[in-house]
Amino acid sequence: MKAARFIQMATVISLATLGGAATASAQSKTFTISWWGYNGEKMNANIIEPFKKICDCNIVFETGNNADRLNKLKLRDGKGVDVIYLSDSFSQQGIEQGMFKEIDQSKIPNLKEIYELGRAPQGKYGPAYTIGRVGLVYDSAKVNPPITSWNDLWRPDLKSAVSLPGITTTAGPMAVIQAGKHAGVDPYADTEKTFKAVEALKSNVVKNYNTGSELVNLISTGEVRVAMAQDFTLASMQAAVKTMTWAKLKEGDIATVNTINISKGSENVDLAYKFIDFILSKDVQQKEAEQGVDAPINTKVQLTPDQAKIWTYGAEQVGSLSLISYSKMNAAKTEWIDQWNEVFGK
Amino acid sequence: MTKLAKWGLPLPATIAVVVLLIIPVALTIATTFGEAKGAFSTYAAFFNSGFRRAVLFRTLEVALITTALSLVIGFVTAYVIAQMPGRLKSIMIIAAVFPLLTGVVVRSFAWLIILGKNGIVNDTLMSIGLITEPLSMLYTEGSVIVAMVYLFVPLMILTLTGVLEGIPRDLTEASASLGAKPIPTFLQVILPLATPGLIVGAVLVFTGSFTSYATPQLLGGEKQMMMGTFLYQRAMVTFDWVGASTVAAIMVVITIAIVSIMSRIARRLNPMAV
Amino acid sequence: MPTRVHPLLGAFAALVFLFLLAPLVIIVGASLSDTTYLTFPPQGLSLRWFANIFQIEAFRRTAITSLQVAFLGTALSLLIGVPAAYALNRYRVELPRWLSTLFVLPILVPEIVFGFSLLKSITIGSGLPVFPSLILGHALLVLPYSVRVVGASLASFDFSIEEAAMSLGCPPLRTFLTVVLPNIQAGVIAAFILAFITSINDVSVSVFLTGPGISTLPIQILAHMEQFFDPTIASVSVLLMLVTVGVMAIIEATLGLTFLTK
């Protein structure tokens, strides 16, 4: 093993000297942000350029989806990036894996301006910077009577008409939680009855989706008429099928948030606090919302009804939502994935 | 001199594979034997689950069918291409590569348009009155195989055209001029000489389809889950790298077994085949 | 000298091409649609999704990275792969059999496990910067094409020609370049094409080997698709095809298109 290790190092080092010359060495003060990577132009104009003036630093991005970036952060033992944007269930996993620093709320004055729900959604860790909903959408031209309850998913007239989020997506486990409620049990305690209810859904499900674009394709080609979805996909679905409607559910929708955390190995902690405070400020949140990037979580943001219609917006709407227990959900997730596979895999 | 060349020429590539692949992957797979419940507990757990065994068998079945279909389709097409005059031949090869230039998401969208409930195939069949209700073609083993064959036929064509080109034409002509019928010429001259190419193609297609995950996920859904998707779930959703590595180790062992069986068959057809 | 092809075989090949090209018609159609979602037949014609590719800075930047990585990675893999393929065929009897299996391993190990392991033990273990490790990872990923596809062409090469050249005093390297290489050209080009395309499309390995400041085009496209479901992805595919056709046209004008074959 030692010899192998030696050859390995020798090869790597010789190759590194050959190829490594091309990449510049790190600058003295570089702030690294891990995030998804879409909407780069707006992110740059609204957040990065103004923040550069505040911090007098270089800004570098690591991009990719939640799982990719969290996996890499873990492999590097929490080093390499300063702040990381994640959706709620992934940031909970990062917390459980010890990847983030605890947050000192006094260093983020703008926290006071955001909705209570978003200040510390996952214990002592990072705040939410945007809020969304998971609910049901349906084609009002083809689904009659309209969908008014989570229980409608089980309706016999919706045979081969439904798409659920796959168990491995952000919203997937929420389908399991709703199935538990439908069966009248606690989904975390009574897995058996919960998955009986999931199984009862099977004949209504055409295919479960794994990405937003897959869902939009299923809707636009008419394969699916009813779906459990996140609100940001609605506009695209309506562009494809005008009659797609966000259902008004009597039980209410489920909240989802995206969080921002300071990584355990951050070497620019003060800057990280400044950055988080900056993206929660009214000015940034206002711009991001007006340009259709993210729904605002700052209570002082003012939107016209037209700007607001694509977002979860306003105290009343936000107040009607509830967060799920991420720690409970993540603890159950492995078991749920197996059960879900068994139900839909047969 | 010969000795130096014999061992020296493959050395850089061998070192690269050992250092960059075998050692790192072995270190990862080694973690699967470190479980508290015993060295093979994760493997026992895998094979004790009926669902996981079903996923394994389905993956094997889909990969083998895909390989067989791609072999036949690719071989015949490559044979025809190899007979074409130079310029047309190049154009056909380029055209065959085009499917590989499309991303998996748009490609599966195209299949949605072709095979979907309101798709082209169903519309055509209904309009000529062959069927009255749209057929459910998507999210079946069939749709996964079609989409995979689509992806692997180009690879087979590219691999085999080069090989079939290399077969000296005077050999087939000699065989024909000696009075051999086309079929014996094919079986006794062309097929053995093409065997190295067929085996390389078969190995590339089998390994490629056995480990694929995006195509089965998009065109098969959960009902057609394959090993690649299962591994992906473990690694990227539950961050269970021990579980993922277990699946990977099982996949590697099975693929090596199948690849060596293929090589053995190939050597029977043509002792020169690697 | 082309020989005649049996009409049935010709018809079969024509059907295969129909199968291969029909989905592309849908993709081209979808890329031209003036809608914010993928649809076919296209509704309204627009080139805006093509313009989108050029307007988004991240696409431009990552496309350059992808091209660099694919080119250098493929070149590196051919540089070490072709000599290996040559030796495996030239000294077939003397070299151990497992050696040829060894070179299939990079596509045999599931890609994400390969990428994960490489990141864990090489990049992090040795502190190798992101860009060279991306190139190394891709070179290894496509090595099977370099070794095996070229090897398949070499299998039908008659090595006695090479011996004849060498016995006439031609030095080994020159013999290889002037006698062997022209005979396996189609195989080398096929290997290059397959390797290049595999590298430029790769997601699973790149996911792990990219890092702060460096990303590749397929990963950037996936990032875009987290939020937008528009036909940009179809446009990228069509653009890749157009670039291929363009490159071929240039080759046709300079070298003649028969370069792909002997």
Q: Where are these predicted regions, by residue range?
A:
Chain A
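Sec/Tat signal peptide C-region and signal peptidase I cleavage site
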Residues: 20-26
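Early extracytoplasmic/lumenal segment of secretory-pathway proteins
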Residues: 27-93
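Extracytoplasmic ligand-binding site segments that recognize negatively charged/polar headgroups
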Residues: 38-44, 80-81, 85-223
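A ligand-binding cleft/hinge motif common to bilobed small-molecule-binding domains
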Residues: 89-93, 220-221, 225-243
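Periplasmic-binding protein-like
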Residues: 132, 196-201, 209, 240-264
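A bilobed periplasmic-binding-protein/Venus flytrap-type ligand-binding module shared by bacterial periplasmic
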Residues: 135-142, 178-181, 257-269, 287-288
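Mature extracytoplasmic/periplasmic domains
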Residues: 263-321
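Extracellular/periplasmic bilobal clamshell ligand-binding domains
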Residues: 305-346
